[in-house]
Protein backbone atom coordinates (compact mmCIF):
# COMPACT_ATOMS: atom_id res chain seq x y z
CA UNK A 1 0.00 0.00 0.00
CA UNK A 2 1.29 3.46 -0.88
CA UNK A 3 1.40 5.18 2.50
CA UNK A 4 1.93 8.52 0.76
CA UNK A 5 -1.80 8.45 0.05
CA UNK A 6 -2.49 8.87 3.77
CA UNK A 7 -1.22 11.69 5.94
CA UNK A 8 -3.46 11.61 9.02
CA UNK A 9 -4.21 8.40 10.89
CA UNK A 10 -6.33 8.04 14.03
CA UNK A 11 -6.50 4.75 15.93
CA UNK A 12 -9.04 3.96 18.65
CA UNK A 13 -8.50 1.08 21.08
CA UNK A 14 -10.86 -0.44 23.61
CA UNK A 15 -10.97 -3.18 26.21
CA UNK A 16 -10.38 -5.93 23.66
CA UNK A 17 -6.73 -5.04 23.22
CA UNK A 18 -5.99 -5.08 26.96
CA UNK A 19 -8.04 -8.18 27.79
CA UNK A 20 -5.48 -10.36 26.03
CA UNK A 21 -2.80 -9.07 28.40
CA UNK A 22 -4.90 -10.20 31.34
CA UNK A 23 -6.54 -6.92 32.39
CA UNK A 24 -9.70 -7.71 34.33
CA UNK A 25 -12.79 -5.53 34.47
CA UNK A 26 -13.90 -6.80 37.91
CA UNK A 27 -17.46 -7.22 36.66
CA UNK A 28 -19.31 -10.51 36.94
CA UNK A 29 -21.72 -11.79 34.30
CA UNK A 30 -24.44 -9.53 35.72
CA UNK A 31 -22.21 -6.47 35.47
CA UNK A 32 -21.78 -6.32 39.24
CA UNK A 33 -18.74 -6.06 41.53
CA UNK A 34 -19.30 -7.64 44.95
CA UNK A 35 -23.05 -7.07 44.47
CA UNK A 36 -22.47 -3.39 43.69
CA UNK A 37 -23.38 -1.89 40.35
CA UNK A 38 -20.33 -0.42 38.64
CA UNK A 39 -22.22 2.87 38.56
CA UNK A 40 -22.18 2.77 42.38
CA UNK A 41 -18.38 2.88 42.47
CA UNK A 42 -17.72 4.99 39.39
CA UNK A 43 -19.49 8.32 39.86
CA UNK A 44 -18.61 11.52 41.72
CA UNK A 45 -21.72 10.94 43.84
CA UNK A 46 -20.48 7.48 44.84
CA UNK A 47 -17.12 8.92 45.90
CA UNK A 48 -18.84 11.55 48.02
CA UNK A 49 -21.20 8.97 49.54
CA UNK A 50 -18.79 6.09 50.20
CA UNK A 51 -15.16 6.99 49.40
CA UNK A 52 -13.80 3.86 51.11
CA UNK A 53 -15.76 1.58 48.78
CA UNK A 54 -14.68 3.52 45.70
CA UNK A 55 -11.03 3.57 46.74
CA UNK A 56 -11.07 -0.18 47.42
CA UNK A 57 -12.47 -0.89 43.96
CA UNK A 58 -9.76 1.18 42.27
CA UNK A 59 -7.03 -0.15 44.55
CA UNK A 60 -7.88 -3.63 43.28
CA UNK A 61 -7.76 -2.46 39.68
CA UNK A 62 -4.54 -0.52 40.24
CA UNK A 63 -2.90 -3.58 41.80
CA UNK A 64 -3.11 -5.30 38.41
CA UNK A 65 -0.69 -2.74 36.99
CA UNK A 66 1.90 -3.81 39.59
CA UNK A 67 1.63 -7.48 38.58
CA UNK A 68 5.03 -8.50 37.15
CA UNK A 69 3.26 -10.86 34.75
CA UNK A 70 1.23 -8.06 33.16
CA UNK A 71 2.80 -6.89 29.92
CA UNK A 72 1.86 -5.32 26.58
CA UNK A 73 0.92 -7.90 23.95
CA UNK A 74 1.83 -8.05 20.23
CA UNK A 75 -1.07 -5.74 19.34
CA UNK A 76 0.33 -2.97 21.53
CA UNK A 77 3.78 -3.45 20.03
CA UNK A 78 2.47 -3.47 16.47
CA UNK A 79 0.89 -0.06 17.04
CA UNK A 80 4.23 1.25 18.28
CA UNK A 81 5.90 -0.09 15.14
CA UNK A 82 3.30 1.66 13.00
CA UNK A 83 3.74 4.94 14.86
CA UNK A 84 7.52 4.79 14.46
CA UNK A 85 7.26 4.21 10.71
CA UNK A 86 4.42 6.63 10.03
CA UNK A 87 5.62 9.84 8.37
CA UNK A 88 2.37 11.77 8.71
CA UNK A 89 0.23 12.72 11.70
CA UNK A 90 -0.43 9.81 14.05
CA UNK A 91 -2.83 9.79 17.00
CA UNK A 92 -3.67 6.84 19.22
CA UNK A 93 -6.81 7.32 21.33
CA UNK A 94 -7.59 4.71 23.96
CA UNK A 95 -10.68 4.09 26.04
CA UNK A 96 -8.55 1.97 28.37
CA UNK A 97 -7.25 3.29 31.67
CA UNK A 98 -4.31 0.88 31.98
CA UNK A 99 -0.71 1.79 31.13
CA UNK A 100 0.00 -0.90 28.52
CA UNK A 101 0.19 1.40 25.50
CA UNK A 102 2.70 3.64 27.23
CA UNK A 103 4.71 0.68 28.49
CA UNK A 104 4.89 -0.62 24.93
CA UNK A 105 6.31 2.73 23.79
CA UNK A 106 3.37 4.63 22.28
CA UNK A 107 4.04 8.38 22.28
CA UNK A 108 1.20 10.23 20.53
CA UNK A 109 -1.38 8.79 22.92
CA UNK A 110 -4.52 10.21 24.52
CA UNK A 111 -6.37 8.49 27.38
CA UNK A 112 -9.92 9.71 26.89
CA UNK A 113 -11.23 7.93 30.00
CA UNK A 114 -8.33 8.83 32.26
CA UNK A 115 -5.45 6.84 33.70
CA UNK A 116 -5.48 4.28 36.47
CA UNK A 117 -1.87 5.10 37.36
CA UNK A 118 -2.68 8.74 38.11
CA UNK A 119 -4.68 10.53 40.81
CA UNK A 120 -5.74 14.12 41.30
CA UNK A 121 -6.75 16.31 44.20
CA UNK A 122 -10.23 17.79 44.33
CA UNK A 123 -8.93 20.61 46.53
CA UNK A 124 -6.06 21.93 44.38
CA UNK A 125 -6.65 20.09 41.06
CA UNK A 126 -3.05 18.85 40.88
CA UNK A 127 -2.44 15.52 39.12
CA UNK A 128 0.11 12.91 40.20
CA UNK A 129 1.52 9.58 39.07
CA UNK A 130 0.28 6.94 41.54
CA UNK A 131 0.60 3.14 41.44
CA UNK A 132 0.16 2.31 45.13
CA UNK A 133 -3.05 1.78 47.08
CA UNK A 134 -4.89 5.00 47.86
CA UNK A 135 -6.33 5.60 51.33
CA UNK A 136 -9.41 7.72 51.94
CA UNK A 137 -7.39 10.10 54.15
CA UNK A 138 -4.38 10.24 51.82
CA UNK A 139 -2.85 13.74 52.07
CA UNK A 140 -2.44 15.48 48.75
CA UNK A 141 1.28 15.52 47.83
CA UNK A 142 0.85 19.14 46.69
CA UNK A 143 -1.50 20.94 49.09
CA UNK A 144 -1.44 18.48 52.00
CA UNK A 145 -5.21 18.40 52.48
CA UNK A 146 -6.87 15.05 53.15
CA UNK A 147 -9.97 13.40 51.75
CA UNK A 148 -9.84 14.82 48.25
CA UNK A 149 -7.38 12.60 46.37
CA UNK A 150 -9.28 10.46 43.86
CA UNK A 151 -8.46 8.27 40.85
CA UNK A 152 -7.79 10.22 37.67
CA UNK A 153 -10.58 8.29 35.94
CA UNK A 154 -13.50 9.66 33.95
CA UNK A 155 -16.55 8.56 35.90
CA UNK A 156 -20.11 8.25 34.68
CA UNK A 157 -21.51 11.73 34.16
CA UNK A 158 -18.09 13.31 33.60
CA UNK A 159 -16.72 14.62 30.30
CA UNK A 160 -14.08 12.43 28.62
CA UNK A 161 -10.64 13.97 28.31
CA UNK A 162 -9.04 15.56 25.22
CA UNK A 163 -12.27 15.67 23.20
CA UNK A 164 -11.47 18.86 21.30
CA UNK A 165 -8.13 17.45 20.16
CA UNK A 166 -9.73 14.11 19.24
CA UNK A 167 -12.54 15.70 17.24
CA UNK A 168 -10.07 17.85 15.33
CA UNK A 169 -7.93 14.80 14.47
CA UNK A 170 -10.98 12.81 13.34
CA UNK A 171 -12.11 15.62 11.08
CA UNK A 172 -8.70 15.60 9.36
CA UNK A 173 -8.21 11.82 9.36
CA UNK A 174 -7.85 9.97 6.09
CA UNK A 175 -7.36 6.61 7.84
CA UNK A 176 -9.25 5.42 10.94
CA UNK A 177 -8.75 2.09 12.72
CA UNK A 178 -10.91 0.85 15.59
CA UNK A 179 -9.51 -2.04 17.65
CA UNK A 180 -11.23 -4.07 20.37
CA UNK A 181 -14.12 -1.69 21.04
CA UNK A 182 -17.70 -2.62 21.92
CA UNK A 183 -19.22 -0.03 19.60
CA UNK A 184 -21.85 0.97 22.15
CA UNK A 185 -20.02 3.40 24.45
CA UNK A 186 -20.34 7.02 23.40
CA UNK A 187 -18.79 9.32 22.42
CA UNK A 188 -16.20 6.83 21.12
CA UNK A 189 -18.83 4.82 19.25
CA UNK A 190 -19.49 7.88 17.12
CA UNK A 191 -15.87 8.40 16.06
CA UNK A 192 -16.23 6.29 12.92
CA UNK A 193 -18.85 8.68 11.55
CA UNK A 194 -16.85 11.75 12.54
CA UNK A 195 -13.91 10.47 10.49
CA UNK A 196 -16.03 11.35 7.48
CA UNK A 197 -13.36 11.29 4.78
CA UNK A 198 -11.23 8.46 6.15
CA UNK A 199 -10.86 4.86 5.08
CA UNK A 200 -12.28 3.00 8.07
CA UNK A 201 -11.05 -0.34 9.46
CA UNK A 202 -12.52 -2.36 12.33
CA UNK A 203 -10.59 -5.12 14.13
CA UNK A 204 -12.61 -6.98 16.73
CA UNK A 205 -13.56 -10.38 18.09
CA UNK A 206 -17.00 -9.99 16.53
CA UNK A 207 -19.13 -7.54 14.61
CA UNK A 208 -20.49 -4.58 16.56
CA UNK A 209 -23.50 -2.31 16.25
CA UNK A 210 -21.39 0.16 14.27
CA UNK A 211 -19.69 -2.38 11.98
CA UNK A 212 -21.76 -1.30 8.94
CA UNK A 213 -20.08 2.13 9.12
CA UNK A 214 -16.64 0.62 8.41
CA UNK A 215 -15.12 -0.12 5.01
CA UNK A 216 -13.35 -3.30 6.13
CA UNK A 217 -13.62 -5.72 9.07
CA UNK A 218 -11.09 -8.14 10.50
CA UNK A 219 -12.47 -10.61 13.02
CA UNK A 220 -10.22 -12.24 15.59
CA UNK A 221 -8.03 -11.59 18.64
CA UNK A 222 -6.23 -8.25 18.59
CA UNK A 223 -2.90 -9.89 19.41
CA UNK A 224 -2.94 -11.74 16.09
CA UNK A 225 -5.10 -9.57 13.84
CA UNK A 226 -3.47 -6.22 14.59
CA UNK A 227 0.13 -7.32 13.83
CA UNK A 228 -1.07 -9.12 10.70
CA UNK A 229 -3.00 -6.10 9.46
CA UNK A 230 -0.20 -3.64 10.18
CA UNK A 231 2.40 -5.85 8.50
CA UNK A 232 0.25 -5.95 5.36
CA UNK A 233 -0.53 -2.24 5.67
CA UNK A 234 3.17 -1.34 5.68
CA UNK A 235 4.12 -3.58 2.75
UniProtKB/Swiss-Prot annotation:
Compartment(s) of residence: Cytoplasm
Keywords: Cytoplasm, Metal-binding, NAD, Transferase, Zinc
Catalyses which reaction(s): N(6)-acetyl-L-lysyl-[protein] + NAD(+) + H2O = 2''-O-acetyl-ADP-D-ribose + nicotinamide + L-lysyl-[protein]; N(6)-succinyl-L-lysyl-[protein] + NAD(+) + H2O = 2''-O-succinyl-ADP-D-ribose + nicotinamide + L-lysyl-[protein]
EC top class named in words: transferase
One annotated GO molecular function: protein-malonyllysine demalonylase activity
Domain of life: Bacteria
Cofactor binding note from Swiss-Prot or TrEMBL: Binds 1 zinc ion per subunit.
Residues that bind NAD(+): 14-33, 95-98, 180-182, 204-206, 222
GO cellular component: cytoplasm
Domain characteristics, as noted in the entry: 2 residues (Tyr-58 and Arg-61) present in a large hydrophobic pocket are probably involved in substrate specificity. They are important for desuccinylation activity, but dispensable for deacetylation activity.
Domain annotation Deacetylase sirtuin-type: ranges: 1-235
Family assignment from sequence similarity: Belongs to the sirtuin family. Class III subfamily.
Short name of any one Pfam family annotated for the protein: SIR2
Full protein name: NAD-dependent protein deacylase
Amino acid sequence: MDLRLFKNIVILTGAGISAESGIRTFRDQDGLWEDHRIEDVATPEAFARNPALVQRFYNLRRAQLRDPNLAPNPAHQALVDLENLWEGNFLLVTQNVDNLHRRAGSKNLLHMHGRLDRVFCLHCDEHFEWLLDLAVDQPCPHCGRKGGVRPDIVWFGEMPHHMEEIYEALDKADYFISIGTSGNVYPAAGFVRLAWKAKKIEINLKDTEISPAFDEHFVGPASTEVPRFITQFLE
